[in-house]
Amino acid sequence: MKLWFNLLCRDIEAQMRFYQALLGLPEAEASRSPIYRALETADFQFGFNAQAAYALLNLADRQPQDSTETPVVAYATLMLDTPEALDKAVAQVPALGGTVLKAPYATYYGQWQAVLCDPEGHVFRLSTLSLPGGA
């Protein structure tokens, strides 16, 4: 099984560039369309749907209004290889237009994790399966 996770976005190109710069993932060029961009690995595709996708998916009545903040009802957790890679990525988030909601911390289940927000307000986490030395 391969997971494809999509975000509904106002600016698909900017969102793709944010995550591409943050994670260093290649674009899934074969999936590119006027209303879709994606990043892809052998294990997953991370997609960005334009606003037109709400109607296409019969979700127009659930499309957030521009003046309202979208509630957090789900979030992706992207697993990185090392605590150092996580710290480096988190340090880039503000310069890329995102927000650090919770700086890297040791979870009670032994992961090194940060809670972040992309430029359009989607919440996501970066995590690793190990803790940095001394944490």
What residue spans do the PLM features occupy?
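N-terminal beta-strand motif that seeds the catalytic metal site of vicinal oxygen chelate
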Residues: 1-17, 73-78, 129-135
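Residue-level marker for the onset of beta-strands and adjacent loop->beta junctions
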Residues: 3, 33-35, 74, 110-112
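Core segments of cupin and vicinal oxygen chelate
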Residues: 6-55
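Hydrophobic pocket/interface hotspot
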Residues: 15, 19, 86, 93
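Short secondary-structure boundary/capping segments
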Residues: 37-38, 64-68, 106
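Short, flexible, mixed-charge acidic loops at enzyme active sites
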Residues: 52-67
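Mid-chain, well-packed structural core segment of small domains
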Residues: 70-91, 97-98
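Vicinal oxygen chelate
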Residues: 90-135
